């Protein structure tokens, strides 16, 4: 019998994770996560964006910070349980819209000048990652930006790892995306705690 093909991590995994804890990855209390979110916002290539798309918003901690840079922001997650917390957290941000989506099977049809693909790609199989990549390219406006952020090391629930996710975009998208490198390197920051080594960050611009 042929072994079954691996599948991307389902929404039920994230629903159960958020039922067990309202903040399972300690976004609000872990200094590594707090520092990473702060760095992500500082590495945005523009002061303000007209229409942004956040893939994998979880409970909306980064969404709160990102919304200040966006006239409109669509934030999606696999988990409706996580989105309930996100909606409460961002209730005073009228420019933010939340939707439950199973990326890449579900994907918005509108165009964006910023797409943030953060800590999601390694939950996908390679075929699904390639589909997501193409849909991101299709919905990114010419001159628009894609910022990717992913943890680099193995975790039991991951199908891929952060380096594979980012390298796939670099190697497979040169015709459509200009790779601008790691924006942290342009800031000349001193990474005293060594946090930057733990996650990958790459910025792209749509050709």
Task: Map each language-model feature to its residues.
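A conserved beta-strand element that flanks and buttresses the S-adenosyl-L-methionine
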Residues: 116
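Class I (Rossmann-like) S-adenosyl-L-methionine-dependent methyltransferase catalytic domain
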Residues: 1-47, 51-55, 59-110, 124-138, ...
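Hydrophobic adenine-recognition pocket in adenosine-nucleotide-binding enzymes
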Residues: 120
């Amino acid at each position: 019998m042929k072994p079954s093909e691996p599948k991307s991590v389902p929404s039920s995994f994230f629903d159960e994770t958020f039922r067990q804890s309202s903040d399972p990855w300690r976004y609000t209390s872990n200094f590594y996560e707090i520092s990473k979110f702060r760095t992500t916002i500082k590495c945005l290539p523009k002061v303000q964006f007209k229409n942004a798309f956040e893939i994998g918003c979880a409970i909306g901690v980064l969404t709160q910070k990102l919304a200040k840079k966006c006239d409109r922001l669509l934030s999606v997650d696999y988990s409706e349980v996580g989105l309930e917390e996100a909606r409460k957290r961002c209730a005073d941000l009228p420019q933010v819209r939340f939707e439950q989506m199973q990326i890449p099977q579900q994907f918005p049809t509108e165009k964006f000048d910023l797409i943030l693909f953060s800590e999601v790609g390694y939950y996908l199989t390679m075929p699904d990652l390639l589909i997501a990549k193409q849909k991101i390219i299709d919905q990114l406006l010419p001159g628009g930006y894609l910022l990717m952020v992913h943890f680099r090391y193995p975790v039991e629930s991951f199908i891929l790892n952060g380096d594979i996710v980012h390298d796939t975009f670099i190697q497979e998208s040169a015709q459509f995306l200009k790779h601008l490198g790691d924006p942290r390197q342009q800031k000349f920051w001193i990474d005293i705690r060594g946090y930057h080594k733990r996650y990958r960050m790459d910025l792209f611009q749509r050709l």
